[in-house]
Amino acid sequence: MRSDKTPDHYIGGFAVHPQYAAEEMQLVSQAYHQDRGVRLRHWIISFEKHELADAWHANQFAQMACRFYADTYQIVYSVHEDAEHLHVHFVMNMISYQNGKRYSGQKKDFYDYLKYLQEIADLFGTYIIRVKDDLSSQNTSPFGANGRLRPLGKR
């Protein structure tokens, strides 16, 4: 993790130590003989300047957002403060540390996650929209390689 992007060190994980995330996720994949194909999911949640007071609040949002998958999948996040707006990168091991099954990535799960995120956003007085950038619009997966979920506006 780059300290220039995370000066306040808001980095965390569930079922994995963030400093050793790559190695620990690889070990889970190997233990279940699932070390081929796509094994990681990456997405970003970004915030407008007026939506959250500071990086601490983005960290609180990120911790809550991770809990949706934390009982089944290793997940790590990092709050980036180096841009005009705060944003959080998430990386999830698609191989379950509980049973070795691969994350299915079905649309129902995506929409359940969006609903869950909206419940969190409600606590912060904002709401979630899905934003497609040029790269993710070419990908049919709800969590494209560059998929972005963005809270937008105060309620």
Report residues per predicted region:
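N-terminal nicking endonuclease/strand-transfer module with a His-rich metal-binding environment
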Residues: M1-R155
